A protein has these predicted regions:
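Active-site-adjacent structural elements that line small-molecule/cofactor binding pockets in enzymes
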Residues: 1-305
Length: 305
């Protein structure tokens, strides 16, 4: 299992922070850097939120090794043909390091504030599958494509120039829902990303995904398994307690949140690796705390190597 960093772009991300974080994450040896795609927070206050694709374009041309991408980008924000075009271009610019994370959308406030239709859950996922169909075809096939859906329609659509990477950037589908998300992942995804679940639940969903992949005629190894999760890390026990504040350690641990010093974090990561997690994206909420990020890298990454 390898480790990557995930940040919430709507929590004050600006150019200075993004550039500083990207350089630090690469220099410290993490496998990747991922970010959310939100206009604003689910609840006030509204903070800086650097635009997704502009920020990823900078990352593609100013890093050498990091894998990166949205975790995840709602199809409700952009027409799927534009998403496919931008993803292919940014992936080419990076030399093939983008993972295209996609989701149905969930945050009502930003959709209302900025004029996007969130839709009810059933229609939201219908739109998501239509978007996936178009994006996947444009990235993976050079045959002109017609599609006549309820939400999207295209005629003789083809993506040019063709992606340098055969099939374009891998598609990641994020979410832990067994009824809607997992079947979509089994059909369309190159990577499935679960969100905030403990090891036992990941193991259950991982097994269910294998069953769904078999129905689709796909090998289990064709889909990478990853998890985005929270972390409360301290260089010593006193710092762990300070970072926890008034939150209940027991309730967080019940959700599988990683809590502790470097040695404790490594032990907890081992349980996720045993459950089938191949990459874990650590949600790093303090965009300015690079000293603690460095301590995490030095204390944890070296023990995983």
């Amino acid at each position: 299992m390898d480790l990557a960093i995930m940040i919430e772009g709507q929590n004050g991300l600006n150019w200075q922070r993004w550039q500083r974080l990207a350089r630090a994450v690469e220099d410290l040896g993490f496998a990747g850097l991922y970010r959310s795609d939100h206009y604003t927070n689910a609840e006030p206050p509204d903070l800086d939120s650097l635009e997704l694709w502009v920020s990823l374009t900078w990352l593609a041309s100013h890093t050498q090794r990091l894998e990166f991408g949205p975790l995840v980008s709602p199809v409700s924000f952009r027409q799927p043909t534009m998403t496919a075009r931008m993803a292919a271009a940014v992936d080419d610019l990076s030399g093939g390091r983008l993972t295209l994370g996609l989701g149905a959308g969930w945050q009502e406030r930003e959709h209302t504030n900025y004029g996007w239709d969130l839709l009810d859950i059933a229609r939201r996922f219908q739109r998501f599958e239509e978007g996936l169909t178009i994006i996947a075809h444009l990235l993976r096939s050079d045959t002109p494509f017609d599609f006549d859906g309820e939400y999207y329609k295209v005629r003789e659509a083809v993506l040019l120039p063709r992606p340098a990477r055969p099939g374009g950037p891998p598609i990641l589908i994020g979410g832990s829902g067994p009824k809607r998300t997992l079947p979509l992942a089994a059909r369309w995804a190159d990577e499935w990303n679960a969100v905030f679940i403990p090891p036992a639940r990941f193991r259950e969903l991982n097994a269910r995904l294998n069953e769904l992949l078999e129905v689709q005629g796909r090998a289990p190894g064709s889909v990478r398994r990853s998890l985005m999760h929270g972390i409360v890390f301290g260089r010593d026990e006193a710092e762990v307690r300070r970072k926890l504040g008034n939150r209940s350690r027991a309730s967080l641990e019940a959700r599988g949140i990683l809590i502790g010093t470097a040695h404790e974090i490594v032990e907890q990561l081992g349980r996720y690796a045993e459950a089938g997690v191949q990459r874990l994206m650590l949600q790093w909420l303090d965009l300015d705390d690079l000293d603690r990020l460095e301590a995490l890298a030095h204390g944890v990454l070296r023990q995983l190597q």
